[in-house]
Amino acid sequence: MNTIEGKLTLTGKEKIAIINARFNHIITDRLVEGAKDAFMRHGGDEKNLSLILVPGAYEIPFALDLAIKSSKFDAICCVGAIIRGSTPHFDYVAAETAKGIAQTTLKYGIPVSFGVLTTENIEQAIERAGSKAGNKGFEAMSSVIEMLNLYKNLKA
């Protein structure tokens, strides 16, 4: 059987954007640092890494659509933190953000990763932004690098 997969390496020429939702910035700043760390560790050139800031997670799909249409990026890593409160707002924002990112990814067919935390409380978010559960920003960037290389392999 022939196995096709993407490697977890960059040549230094790939242009990748991180779209970061500023809301809950104490968490999302750590996700961005994790994503940047993964980009650099896997061979990225910092001049080819861009940070796109949006107010909150709900705005990520729109910024993603604009970033892809700009043709400036080979892949995009989306990060944010949606933390449940006492109203149903969490459910709507989490669902629409996930759906919007997925639809935009499929619409344009370029590698995009989903590093948006959806947690029950701030403690869970902190755990996933660099403490007990690792850094989901690092994981999201690693995923998009692997998918970018898979995309190149399958497109060739």
UniProtKB/Swiss-Prot annotation:
Name of protein: 6,7-dimethyl-8-ribityllumazine synthase
Name of the gene: ribH
Enzyme class: transferase
CDD domains: Lumazine_synthase-I
Pfam families in the cross-refs: DMRL_synthase
E.C. code: 2.5.1.78
Keyword terms of this UniProt record: Riboflavin biosynthesis, Transferase
GO molecular function: 6,7-dimethyl-8-ribityllumazine synthase activity
NCBIfam families named among the record's database cross-references: lumazine-synth
Pathway: Cofactor biosynthesis; riboflavin biosynthesis; riboflavin from 2-hydroxy-3-oxobutyl phosphate and 5-amino-6-(D-ribitylamino)uracil: step 1/2
